[in-house]
Amino acid sequence: MPVYLPPISRRRFIKGSLAASALVAAGGCASHTSASDPNSWALLSDIHIAADPNTVHNNVNMTRNLRMVAEEVVAWPEPVSGVLINGDLAFNSGDLADYAAILGLLRPMREHGLPIHLALGNHDHREHFWATLPEEKSADASLPERQTALVRTPHANWFVLDSLIATLQTPGRLGDAQRAWLTRALDANQDKPALIAVHHHPDLNLVHVPALEDTAALLEILRPRRHVKAWFFGHTHRWSVFHDESGLCLVNFPPVAYLFEDGQPNGWVHATLRSDGARLELRCLDHARKDHGQVENLVWRV
């Protein structure tokens, strides 16, 4: 199922189906699009877009925030090779009109030549999302009810997972079939660092927000496979970077949309991938914040 929006400029070559292109689909994979810096990525989460662009929640206009981020991404001095949005695309319950609005707001980045990789969160609705993008559906039915993807880059492979249980059900779960797919995919791709992207955070008593229910089962897969270097997540509407007991990097993306607690930033993260780690730069919507431009230099475990 679709997790990938191609650059608009390439659509004339696709002819209604992405199956023959660099589609990232359920159980499938794709290479990064050509760009001046293939290791440069824009990482977003929790955009929470409503059909009505004037919708405000927690004193935040989500449409305005995403527009601001998109403008900054396309103007980035080292052009990014791709965009990852790590779940909670829709405002509340994933209405069809929400996804139509999201496509419109993402269009400037796609017209700039950027592919956009999408994960789903607990505020999303799979069937409504797929209905909005009928021509993007893949014929690959290896995981027909989930959105999983392998995205290859020169220095690392992204494994994008789907933790949505049901719309408006706050916790997340991967399930047996998806974890089995991930195990096979990781074992078949040990040549580069593996980076896990999933909307829900690990259940490690980080915050008082329902987490990924099968955290323990996922960590049993990730921790012993030393080529797995990091777990990137959203959901908590917080920004943090730390390591677990095995040396696995745990990166919590800030929300593009609203905050759950005062003092946290909203914005996005610019990532520069290396063979031995990654440089993460926090890009706050409020450029006056002290942590705007904060850099975290990650070094992968060995």
Describe every region a protein language model picked out.
Residues 95-184, 188, 193, 214-227, ...:
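Extended active-site neighborhood of metal-dependent phosphoesterases/phosphodiesterases
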Residues 19, 48, 90, 123-125, ...:
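Catalytic metal-binding/acid-base residues of hydrolase active sites
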Residues 31-99, 191, 205:
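N-terminal active-site segment of His-dependent metallophosphoesterases
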Residues 189-206:
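Short acidic, glycine-rich surface-loop motifs adjacent to enzyme active sites
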Residues 44-45, 83-87, 116-121, 161, ...:
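Active-site neighborhood of phospho(di)ester-bond hydrolases with catalytic His/Asp-centered motifs
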Residues 9-26:
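N-terminal export leaders
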Residues 272-302:
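A short C-terminal boundary segment appended to hydrolase-like catalytic domains
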Residues 1-9:
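N-terminal secretory signal peptides
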